[in-house]
Curated annotation (Swiss-Prot):
One Pfam entry name: DsrE
UniProt organism field: Buchnera aphidicola subsp. Acyrthosiphon pisum (strain Tuc7)
InterPro entries noted in UniProt: DsrEFH-like, Sulphur_relay_DsrE/F-like, Sulphur_relay_TusD/DsrE
GO CC entries: sulfurtransferase complex
Keyword Kinase: no
Subcellular location: Cytoplasm
GO molecular function per UniProt: sulfur carrier activity; sulfurtransferase activity
NCBIfam families the record matches: PRK00207.1, sulf_tusD_dsrE
Family: Belongs to the DsrE/TusD family.
Name by which UniProt lists this protein: Sulfurtransferase TusD
Function per UniProt: Part of a sulfur-relay system required for 2-thiolation of 5-methylaminomethyl-2-thiouridine (mnm(5)s(2)U) at tRNA wobble positions. Accepts sulfur from TusA and transfers it in turn to TusE.
GO biological process: tRNA wobble position uridine thiolation
């Protein structure tokens, strides 16, 4: 089966993101196809490379990046939701008087059109 995952919870403070990540790992281990993960609402905070968990805590941002590198899973971040929450890529900084963006590597800003395309080609969408 083809899956798209929608993550609406932040990386820390709720279990939405960590549960989504564990579910994604399970999908891939059982040979399902994970087309993409779309981060929306507070879920866009998963793409903030300035998030620094304590040394003895699981680093969920690094885990998402590892999922992308190992399995080529697309990590889409809603552009509008990201801007509202202060997550921005370097290329968008020209007019904002900000020196460095904080969009983590492996994450890609996109619009809801990417979510719609993913939903269209997948068998299941699951929201966390």
């Amino acid at each position: 089966m083809n899956y798209t995952i929608l993550v609406t919870g932040p990386p820390y403070g709720t279990q939405n993101s960590s549960t989504a990540f564990l579910f994604c790992q399970s999908l891939l281990k059982t040979k399902h196809i994970l087309h993409s993960v779309f981060f929306y609402c507070d879920g866009v905070l998963n793409a903030n490379n300035m998030t620094t968990p304590a040394i003895d805590e699981f680093n969920l941002i690094n885990a998402w990046q590892g999922l992308n590198k190992k399995h080529q899973v697309k990590l889409y971040v809603c552009n509008s939701a990201a801007l509202r929450r202060g997550v921005i890529e370097d290329e968008k900084l020209l007019n904002m008087n900000v020196k460095k963006g904080n969009l983590a590597l492996s994450f890609q800003l996109s619009g809801l059109i990417e979510l719609a395309k993913s939903i269209k080609i997948c068998d299941r969408i699951i929201q966390f």
